[in-house]
Swiss-Prot record:
Keyword Phosphoprotein: no
Keyword presence, GTP-binding: yes
Name of the coding gene: tuf1
Region (G2): 60-64
Protein name: Elongation factor Tu
Amino acid sequence: MAKEKFERKKPHVNVGTIGHVDHGKTTLTAAITTIMAKKYGGTAKAYDQIDAAPEERERGITISTAHVEYESASRHYAHVDCPGHADYVKNMITGAAQMDGAILVVSAADGPMPQTREHILLSRQVGVPYIVVFMNKADMVDDPELLELVEMEVRDLLSSYDFPGDDIPIIVGSALKALEGEDSDIGVKAIEKLVETMDSYIPEPVRNIDKPFLLPIEDVFSISGRGTVVTGRVESGIVKVGEEVEIVGIRDTQKTTCTGVEMFRKLLDEGRAGDNVGVLLRGTKRDEVERGQVLAKPGTIKPHTKFEAEVYVLSKEEGGRHTPFFNGYRPQFYFRTTDVTGTCDLPSGVEMVMPGDNVQLVVSLHAPIAMDEGLRFAIREGGRTVGAGVVAKIIE
């Protein structure tokens, strides 16, 4: 058994607790780490250790997040918990904490509340693929019919945001009782059941290396006698010498062939996710490629100009704008390696957006950018970051 502790061969999955304030997210996080540490090794974290989350800066945005980790029978989990609602908004929009799945905590005594709804909407917008529900504070509810009612409400709410409400697993328990060590169905057993459910319901994420090849172009050189080289860090997948690739974004998509891959001045057979490489392109002229385009496996990514976005606008304290912006606002949108000007349409009924707000916008870019739903971007004015966003839905 002692050997088990040092096994780091388990697959790694990122999760987080979401839900309304005071419904017990942090208590649940503490309970999971405590109970899993006893079973599989690792460090138990107390409520106040998690609650005093350190401030981090992600793209200039101040976010308080607690990171804990624990093992289950088959996995290693990294788990994020945020102290305040604003921290969740910022975390999910910037992608500072990518979640392969979320644990939605709902108090059985109160049922779904405004932030429950908002966190489900955010999960949908930023592409959190799976949600598991923990109905907390079950020790405070004597009436089984009330539990059923709350469960139905939660399922309806999830369905209304396009999650499979009828099929989502709901575990009923009391994080507090579990933390106190009570070995009842709503105590320790409920936490064990929750983690087993995460193991079975949240699929293992596709590793970057297994996704299609994508390289955001940072620089372009021409090497006399050899042709044009583009450089950048491979975001996903693998490119092999001799393979056909597409240059996507800003201009019309063009096909070319990778005739060489170089890293640290050495020639390689392939470039893999995470590598900083130079890729030699056959027959492509220096002025046909530019920073801000991507090199990609043919047919896997398309250029778009119009999309719905979920956006967080930096507060004045974070170095953002001091004044609101209105419909027709035209900042720069920074995607991967470059800025593109775009125009913002506010939702009907929204007159203006204040610093510190989060909002859904429709963005129309002045040049097409290679994108998929879930792509993060920054909003800038003259090189200064004033917001962060994520592509929620592509329109055209």
